[in-house]
Amino acid sequence: MGSRSVRCFLAAAVMTVGLSLGAGPAPAADTVADCQAMMASGKYAECLAATTKAIEEKSYGEEWPILKAQSEQALGKYPEALATIVAGIERYAWSARLRHLEYESALANGKKEQAAAALMEVEKQVATASWRYTDADDLAAIGWVAIALGADAKAVQEGFFERARKNYSNRPDGFLAAGRLALDKGDVAFAAELLTPAAKEFETNAEIQFLLSEAISSADREQSAQLLQKTLELNPHHVGAMQRVAERQIDLEDYSGAEETIRQMLSVNPHLPEAHALQTVIHQLSNKADAAAQSRAAALKYSVVNPKVDHLIGRKLSQKYRFAEAAAAQRSALELDPEFNPARVQLAQDLLRLGQEAEGWQLAELAHDKDGYDTTLFNLLQLKDSLGRFTTLTSPHFQVRMEKQEAAVYGHRVLALLEDSWTELTPRYEFLPELPVMVEIYPRADDFAVRTFGIPDVSGFLGVCFGKVITANSPASRRDHPTSWESVLWHEFCHVITLQKTGNKIPRWLSEGISVFEERRADVRWGQHMNHDFRDRILGDKITPIGQLSSAFLTAKSGEDMNFAYYESSMVVEHIVSVHGLPALKAVLNDLSTGIQINDALDRHTGGLEALETSFRSFLKEQAKGWAAGVDFSKEAFAEAKPTDLESVKLFLETHPANFPALMTQASLLLQENRQEEAEAALKKLVEQVPGDASTNGPRRLLADVYRKRRETEQEAAILTEHLARTADDLEAAMRLQDLCIEAKQLERVIEQGQTIFGIDPFQIAAIQKTLAAAETLKQNEVAVAQLSTLLELQSDDAPRLHYRIARIQQEIDSIQSRRHVLRALEQAPRFREAHALLLELKRAETATEPAE
């Protein structure tokens, strides 16, 4: 529908608000209502029987053929549904809803010409008799027709669906249409905003409950799951809800559960394209090419030109990181329908994740030209603008894109670390990844989220690897929660190895487990380690079965749950390597690359999954028992006792002498009462009992506070050194230790701590200045110049003096560089006397070294 037609309809609709003119007497509302209730509750066969009888008895009203056709479609009787609609149109030629249904049904039957004709007929009807179509359901139907004809989605949202909502607030039609369109365009915030009150108003409407579940699925998983359950209670055969259940089961690698859900879907509609498409996905993930082809053919049985089938297949494959196969599926969808924009959007994202940027961005721009409302496309193109301000660093094996200032500050160290990871890991796993490995580091968390997930406001991820492409959050985006960015990049490059080596056919738990395992091998301070929470879970028999580890990442309800999933996965890998050797692990990866399933690969190389499960549980429990043996970490008894002061804590400890929460509380209370010696003794004992505790609020950090208050700097430095040997993330402790090293005149250690701090937060100006001072004193000129160069980026207002200091250091080392920097100083501060004097010195030295004629 062209913009003129939209405007004409809207103008007419404004004039006729409140009118609802039909072409005859209304049908018996209670009878129609009964059939509508049957459809809404999933009683499709009963609805079909009732509507068939009503039509045979010549009952009047467009609702009868509409409901009959909808029930036939729900049961997979696609040709019959189209015949019902055509017959209905013969009697109700004015019905825009029947024409819209004809469009959908014709597409479901592969009749594109008939579908196009139905759209044109609606457009003609609206243009000539717009006064007829002002009811909520008509507005919704005509709005969808307008979308199909290429109308601007925002204009449709405002001109049709919003009008249906506002003029008929007691009807669900406008809310359903507006919510569905918002979700189709990725506008989940708007969808949630309008559907939240609608779900309360229409609490028995299964479709509204389902759409709200979809809208909040990222923001509130628990509430979304409850709404999904409510949907299925209202309609046990709700296609969208059952599809979402099956998709979730696929995400969790519960393929048998997904197949059971698919069987339930097919028991209602044996020809449901979505069900067969999801079965195709499972077959492809299981390396069953012939079965996948058969399922795809079944999905396309009635419409071989349906692009939604391949689009769904590709979307799920993409979510499983099978980007090459996913892209191929989207290309197939576009071959069937070159104008199917959702496939173009998904293909653009898949190509970007494959590192095929030129075509990926071209497709994104083309898709945006076709649909300016799609928020995913808007976010992607905003991201492209941000990337245009990045610079590219290269090394033999990597191409790193960073914001320009960040690249100047720590880009050199990024490249060095990545090359170190290549040198260490490629021979270890006997695999050379495709070159170049592309790394993108984002200073804005939303840019990282859009590049990685297609949407902003996704938190909790430090980095992601797609196979050839790594995306990571810059330390600048994590300054409130600092972590070692070096460990993140090492972790992600390990994913490059495991994903590419297996053709992205590796289960998430194994890929994550290997990455964390290799983090710990590279640096004992990196990766997840045993802690009291993990210990309690393990000894409390909450070990996740190996076969369910991948799902543990998706079902985690807290950061602790997620960290435990990483830890468990890494310990499975450690156990495999310690018992069966690294060659067994590599053999599993090789098997996965050929399409062998993980359980079969483990059977072949680790003695079988059942035996591995048993030995792993024993191994992990031994690790837990050996960590802080004899210490009681339980919180329940201490919480029940509710001690309020030091004496009551001591009283509790008389019967619970090894209770860690009580011992820590005792130490804290002793500190509050300034009983330093007693606090020191208590904390020393805790350090001995729990030597592996590297938490920022653990006994070592509290003991360091004791020494700091007593100004016992040597002891404070010693305990902080112990602490920082176990963690690479405690920025505050690292900065304090650097200060202590300055006080002790341990300048080498000042520089060492400066490097540690740089590996957490390279933008700490105070730490850089302290490292610089130590380097200058020790005449470590290379280190000093590096610190000054960093300060040039972070303190541009002091650039003349910084250039001068670099020139002074390099005067005896590299006169050319010295001259360049002194000239830069004078360029920015022409009256800089010291710089003029240095330039003269350089000139005299240059003249003195020139050969005589």
Question: Which residues are covered by each model-predicted region?
Answer:
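Start-of-helix register in tetratricopeptide repeats
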Residues: A29, E63, R97, D135-L139, ...
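Residue-level recognition of tetratricopeptide repeat
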Residues: Q36, Q70, E104, W144-A146, ...
